[in-house]
């Protein structure tokens, strides 16, 4: 999407070459370093992938702050992303420019091999796979489960052997990795975190372009963002259907049950603001953006439903 738009809208003045996997860099940290140095122009990562350089981006992983896609998309297309961009530029001495935040795979939900999870008490004692980052481990502990960092490639076998009994992933990842074949049969659609995709560009390379080409690039990232908003929705519908057809148990919490999860996870916000530089500032910006988005949607619903 980005390549086609930018190359056509610039009449070929801007070319886009796409390098997959480790063609340009060995891991996420190395890739971001390459962008900061200017040897790589653009790189996509997750909040966890960027947290080593700018820990405050983990605000996107804080649970139960955005209710649904409409809220999330309104937030991420507005001033909140600009706020995060400015904080990122400051944290990297003007090197890394956040161009947009899209979506990588829908929403994170809790899934496990043992039982249906309807309330936080059902999480008690479950061994939940997390990444090594602190924030997701704090969330799992807050809900009464045991965080167990396991490398992604080892997760299938870890489900089979019982080393872990659950995870916090999107349904497309669950089905793509065939985790139900390893015993993952219970998914609770709590939607605790939006799976953000963060696109960074070398700031000097961007600012060194003429105004008209900068506009083309900005518009290209807007087109890319919209495409990433749409694709996971379609893929998720197909993945949910396949999960249920395969015998999986798919549970949708009631509003009251979801409120119980949010209340139990409340201490994670306290941990974030107390332990992450810029945490209080970026969390306040996110909450303000969510409140504004919810108010706009409430007005729209009032008009559309009556």
Model-predicted segments: where are they?
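N-terminal secretory/targeting leader peptides
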Residues: 1-71, 89-306
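Hinge/lid segment of periplasmic solute-binding proteins
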Residues: 76-94
